Regions:
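Amphipathic alpha-helical dimerization/coiled-coil segments
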Residues: 66-118
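Active-site metal-binding core of divalent-cation-utilizing nuclease and nuclease-like domains
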Residues: 41, 86-92, 109-150, 155-169
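Short, low-complexity, polar/charged sequence segments that are solvent-exposed and flexible
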Residues: 72-76, 138, 169-172
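Nuclease-adjacent, charged terminal/linker segments that flank catalytic cores
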Residues: 1-84
Length: 172
């Protein structure tokens, strides 16, 4: 479910979310990929190599659809669309946002007083708040009995909007 909603995770992010060691995560991810639950790709880099990036595979989509009592078509899953994120110009932005939240979730997994109680991607935020605000993510963090709701604005100078213009909608 998490992968379907957030579109793509690196092997390192998945390890942070659910495993104690990267090697264990990579073994499990290889198995899930071989079974068709996940698909993976490795973006091209000019130097070095990128970690594998994982998206929902056809078997994973069928499992998710069955869990929700709908068809794969109703779910809106298409393998080509899932894999197209590999060439999406905003892939680095999605990975930064997912990396931030994966780090919080990983911290919470290792610290019993902490919890990432909510984690919404940009698409879900847009569906909820429309054009009023357009955060890259929303979260609810709990730690030691205190809860904080927050919006993530991930600006790396790639969008033609000033930070003050982006924050204006939050006043409402």
């Amino acid at each position: 479910r998490l992968l379907a909603e957030h579109r793509v995770f690196t092997s390192h992010q998945i390890a942070n979310l659910a495993f104690n060691h990267l090697d264990t995560a990579e073994d499990r991810l290889r198995t899930l990929t071989a079974l068709g639950v996940l698909d993976r790709f490795r973006p091209r880099r000019d130097t070095g190599s990128a970690p594998y990036h994982y998206v929902l595979g056809p078997i994973g989509a069928a499992m998710l659809a069955a869990e929700q009592g709908v068809t794969v078509a109703d779910l809106g899953y298409r393998r080509a669309t899932a894999l197209a994120v590999a060439h999406y110009r905003r892939l680095p932005e999605i990975l930064r946002v997912n990396g931030f939240f994966a780090a919080l979730a990983g911290y919470a997994r290792r610290h019993p007083d902490a919890e990432l109680a909510a984690w919404w991607p940009q698409r879900r935020c847009q569906a909820n708040w429309g054009r009023l605000i357009q955060p890259h993510g929303f979260g609810r963090w709990r730690d030691d009995g205190t809860a904080v709701d927050f919006f993530l604005e991930c600006d790396h100078g790639e969008e033609p909007i000033s930070i003050t213009a982006a924050l204006a909608g939050y006043d409402d």
